[in-house]
Amino acid sequence: MKRPGRKREKDNGHEGRSSSSGLSSSRNFESTALPGDVQHADLSLVPPDPTPSPRLSEPAESFHMDMFAGPLTPLDSFLSPGLSGMRDCLTELLATPINFSELGLIDPILSNFAQEQHEIACLFGSDGASTDPDLLSGQSQLEFNLSPRPSSSGDQSLAEGGPKCSDKSKCHAICGCMMRALNLINTLFSSRASSSTSSSSSGFPRDSASGSTPTRPDSLLEALLAENRESMEIVHTILKCECGEMTYLIPMLSIAVVKVLERYALTARELAGDLGLDGKYKDPDRPFNSSVDDDHSSGRTTAQLILNELHRVQGAVNLVERLLKEDSLEDCVRRGQQCPVSSSPVAFSPTTVHQMNTDLRRRLTTLSSEIINILRQS
């Protein structure tokens, strides 16, 4: 005897079929139901047979995206009706033009933005030329930057005579005193003139023939004197400039003057050692020796040349002292008061600058005394 439930279980096992197959299985269930209690079952358990809804009538495969679709397949075919409607609303919102006058009602700050001109065409005239004053000022600035620079002869004249500037804060950009001072210090500390003079056997020439007149100093001494002379001329030119960088330049130039004095002092001490003086006066009872007297005559000439060059160093020291007095730096240091700070950047304290000036004058006085002593003993 066949059981009617077998057919129902078989029909309900196919879940992947469409909804129409499911409805047909329900009809078969009604026709094959057993009489008796099964037929008197509650009719509410039997699914009704109304007109199927659109969602249930769609095939099940429409709810799944084809993973093997081509890359050019439009995405709209996979969107549900709800997502498609949201996309249409977003597109309409972005395509709507913005009314800036309405933004002013929301925020007062945005009202100013609505009144301004935001079109590029209004910045240009009919011929395509710019009419914006900001652009015109930028164009004139560009023409100024591309203007030809002064010739080298003009720069040389500024370097030689020193510029006269009404605005001291801008003068240093024209004269270049800071760069010249740095180059001077580099030249003095890297030059081999002093070392070449010290390595020579004598700072002055010796004549082989006895009784001959002293000749000119040798080439090494001439090179030393010429280089020191040129260095002191640069120092004088920078000190006479009216730029606003003197608080930096005075200490740097003081270092340069110290280096020049050191060269002169080294030559003078070598001269005294070669003459055998060692700070002592010449013995008048010493027997006459023509060669020794010739050496003393040549040494006297060299000492006189060095002494004549010291007036340049004396002038530079006087200029530095005058500049310090003009700024009232030296007076406040002597009184022990707090010195005023100038408007320009101060590289060293006034006390340090005053001490450097005092050291310069002491070195100059000591060197002058040594050379005068050589002249007296020779």
Curated annotation (Swiss-Prot):
Residues 143-156 have a biased composition (Polar residues). One of its GO terms (biological process) is regulation of DNA-templated transcription. The keyword Transcription regulation applies. InterPro entries: AflR. Residues 1-59, 143-167, 195-217 are annotated as: Disordered. Residues 8-17 have a biased composition (Basic and acidic residues). Residues 18-27, 195-212 have a biased composition (Low complexity). One of its GO terms (molecular function) is DNA binding. Keywords: DNA-binding, Metal-binding, Nucleus, Transcription, Transcription regulation. It comes from the Eukaryota. One of its GO terms (cellular component) is nucleus. It is found in: Nucleus. Transcriptional regulator; part of the gene cluster that mediates the biosynthesis of the tetrahydroxanthone dimer neosartorin, which exhibits antibacterial activity. This is Transcriptional regulator nsrA. The lineage of its organism: Eukaryota, Fungi, Dikarya, Ascomycota, Pezizomycotina. The gene is nsrA.
